[in-house]
Amino acid sequence: MYEIGGFYMKRKLSLALAGTMILSLFGFAPAAFANDAESISDDLVKAAQEEGELTVYGSCEEEYLAAACQKFEDLYGIKVSYQRLSTSEVYTKISEEAGNPSGDVWFGGTTDPYNEAVAADLLEPYEAENAVNLISDDYKDPTNCWYGIYKGILGFMVNTEELERLGLEAPRTWDDLTKEEYQGLIMLSNPNTAGTAKLVINTMIQMKGHDEAMEYFKALDKNVSQYTKSGSGPSKMVGPGECVIGVGFLHDGIYQILQGYDNIELIVPEDGTSFEIGATAIFKGCAHPNAAKLWIEYALTPDCVNIAKENGSYQFLVLSNATQPEEAEQFGLDMNNTIDYDFEDAKNNIAQYVEDFFAALGDSADDRFMTE
């Protein structure tokens, strides 16, 4: 059931099957351990089961978050609670709770806010055994504070029916978005609440340089009707026609198309684009450190990532032993067709870049930045 408070939702998942619990009482691991978790230490599993519970803050889509938490509970007999929060909301929450977090692990969402948390010493380093499954060390933090699980491509989603009705061509480049003909037709997300928006800011700075990027955002803002709370917000508005052009991750657009919105076209910007690494991490000072470590090991296995596409998430996976979602390639996406994104610059400067973004826009945009 849901427990709603402020902007947060929390679901208590049911306990694992009674048989699993009985086996655990007698010191036996559930049979499911023999699947993809075979490299996980028996001592870690036992220590995690003794703690008995885990709280997850999730920044991926809730359908996948719920499934991943339920799978972990079924595998290990550990009670899981979760909250679905945007990445910036998680960062704000753990900053306020520094040293005594109410959650144990962070799951999903772009790594720009994760890197802010690394810089603020809010994440616990952990050398995961299953990190050997990563296709490249580029998909983990150099200090082992977070590990990547998926990769999402940034781009545009457009409502082809509305564009045709308006007699407009679809934008093909980032600069196209500033054309006067798109006034009031575009939605982005709010960098105060969504890591996706921070990625957009970093991407433009890396592609254009800082000052030119700020001028770009001033021009783009004239065409933006709303900055949504969630990074996936624009994708959900395109199909129904609430916005004509949404900027966000293209896997969110795939989900909308498969939900029946065949009026959506996905566009990879011709002048280049960047990507998110969706990650997972342990909060420093968490109440259940062994269960948190076990979660990291689990997240780096097919048991966790292969169920993403079964639950509406079609990002590319960054584990060598995972099965890529065929839907991503069917819609023409290429996980390697991206710029060489500078994560260090993003980590060191994103807070200042967000301040500069709002300073460039001034007060005129305030009522368009959604927080609910």
Predicted feature residues:
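Conserved C-terminal helix/tail region of periplasmic/extracytoplasmic solute-binding proteins
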Residues: 337-372
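Alpha-helix capping/helix-boundary segments
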Residues: 19, 112-113, 234, 252-253, ...
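Extracytoplasmic ligand-binding site segments that recognize negatively charged/polar headgroups
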Residues: 55-69, 81-97, 101-242
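Periplasmic-binding protein-like
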Residues: 152, 216-221, 227-228, 260-284
